[in-house]
């Protein structure tokens, strides 16, 4: 699996801000980076799964859509919520969050984000799934977060079945703090003068 090194992430983010493709694709890419979910989880996301007005916004992904067949909670950073607000202006906020450009009743193509990465000059160097690896590396190396909280946020299942049977903790309070820290870390990787203007990306 092709994945960027953490040192390559700042340049990628700057190139992403210059992306000239469809606006929903741009927003989808930013949302994937902020949440490091799997591509399939993003493509099939429905608005009914999101609780955005809560003091602790969260995305609840149903078990049937998860690789490990277990319901997954994604605490949403302020930045992720702002992305979704912009997405709602495009997709309508009623059914699919990231619909196909050609048919609002069908999900975004499974290769849409990958091809956008290629257009940015990262063919064979990066994939959408690779952001999960980058996030895992940075979060673990920061030594700010419990490894179990990181693994739970990545929706990985404990390989040790005995431990898995006893460790059902969601680590939600820590994961909320971690996801906000991650979003702020991502934003800090760009030069201070580079302010994300979501409106500049065409619909």
PLM region spans:
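Short, polar N-cap/turn motifs at the start of nucleic acid-interacting alpha helices
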Residues: 48-56, 123-125, 144-165, 188-194
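C-terminal catalytic core of tyrosine-transesterase DNA break-rejoin enzymes
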Residues: 4, 30, 34-41, 112, ...
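Short, contiguous acidic/charged loop-to-helix segments that flank catalytic cores in large enzymes
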Residues: 1, 16-20, 62-73, 99-105, ...
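Basic, Lys/Arg- and aromatic-enriched nucleic-acid-binding interface segment
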Residues: 1-45, 55, 67, 90-91, ...
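Active-site/catalytic core of tyrosine-dependent DNA strand-transfer enzymes
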Residues: 1-10, 75-125, 134, 142-143, ...
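Short hydrophobic short-linear motifs embedded
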Residues: 196-201
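Conserved tyrosine-mediated DNA breakage-rejoining catalytic core shared by Y-recombinases
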Residues: 43-86, 158, 164
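Catalytic-site neighborhood detector that most strongly recognizes the C-terminal catalytic loop/helix
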Residues: 61-69, 81, 144, 154-189
């Amino acid at each position: 699996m092709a994945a960027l090194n953490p040192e390559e992430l700042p340049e990628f983010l700057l190139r992403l801000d210059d992306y000239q493709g469809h606006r929903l694709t741009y927003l989808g890419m930013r949302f994937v980076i902020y949440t490091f979910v799997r591509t399939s989880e993003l493509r099939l996301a429905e608005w009914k799964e999101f609780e955005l007005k809560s003091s602790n916004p969260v995305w609840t992904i149903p078990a049937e859509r998860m690789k490990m067949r277990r319901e997954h909670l994604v605490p949403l950073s302020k930045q992720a919520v702002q992305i979704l607000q912009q997405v709602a202006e495009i997709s309508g906020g009623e059914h699919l969050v990231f619909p196909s450009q050609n048919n609002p009743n069908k999900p975004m193509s499974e290769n849409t984000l990958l091809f956008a990465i290629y257009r940015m000059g990262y063919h064979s160097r990066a994939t959408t799934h690779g952001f999960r690896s980058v996030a895992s590396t940075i979060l673990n190396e920061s030594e700010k977060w419990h490894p179990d909280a990181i693994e739970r946020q990545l929706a990985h299942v404990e390989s040790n079945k005995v431990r898995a049977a006893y460790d059902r903790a969601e680590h939600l309070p820590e994961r909320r703090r971690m996801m906000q820290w991650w979003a702020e870390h991502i934003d800090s990787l760009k030069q201070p003068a580079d302010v994300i203007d979501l409106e500049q990306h065409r619909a």
